């Protein structure tokens, strides 16, 4: 209920109270927080490159997205797995991330980390159906919005739904 923890204690049986809950998203005991960057200028982004046959049709659109971002950021990286890229966003190592052609298991855990760390996650249209649609945008509030705005003009019709 509103992300609060409720506990029912039976003091009559002298049971100890439960331990305090761990932070929502943590690394080595420290709470994860998305970066505080305010724009894409100087941002470090993560992405994945289309590689399956059914994604190659969208390669030109992807490259247009890439071109529109590479000049205004500090760089674009690929860690090797979408889940790891999303964890980097949650830890503030990346300011934002985008990719398409993913499966639910590629995104679910990392998306939860980003949300727990104070970030935003959506599909390319800004809705919360990224698990169903297989494409994702994630980041801190400012970079997320700027990334979404920058890539949307380059979306093929199949990804605008």
Label every PLM stretch briefly.
Residues 25, 31-34:
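Generic detector of contiguous secondary-structure segments
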Residues 1-26:
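DPxDG-like acidic metal-binding loop motif
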Residues 33-161:
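An extended, acidic
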